[in-house]
């Protein structure tokens, strides 16, 4: 149950620059913090295991301040970190990071506006709500790919390529029979199986901070600052002009 008193799902997802959903994890309850929900996902474990390889290739995903900094996950500088940002380099990094992250915001916005079922409360149990979200994302991708001419509309194998993450140990969302829905299961509440040893959280943050610092310096070296904010005015002829 969410803090506002109704049942909901926390849906984690990744997309590309075309706003196609690449990965979806709709198996946490609505009151779960985003960082905790992402930490419950198998994708998070996989990224931790591949941290060194991803770092060598300069690859990472982008998130907002709700997530924890990691070498595979870049997040913006917070207000405390920016207190000594005299050159506005951290602010410039935040601006460009936000410019990348906006694609997922737009993807969710288009998903909601495209399918009228999301314009109101979903009057289904949480298990069915999860399936509805997954199918809507698949159709959303299909429309984008058809629009860009990247898919044969008669190809039935198209929908087999989308990664939908559910629980390994318990494939469906658990609900108590005859009772109000309880917290959604995460791998049946058992420790997740892991592969190679992974770095601890503090080391992970330090490595992430090092990568973020190097990116910040690189942006500053190329003078990629946040664009100046301009004020818009009208002259007597009604023409618009800008002042900084």
Label every model-predicted segment:
Residues 1-244:
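Short, well-ordered secondary-structure "scaffold" segments embedded in the functional core
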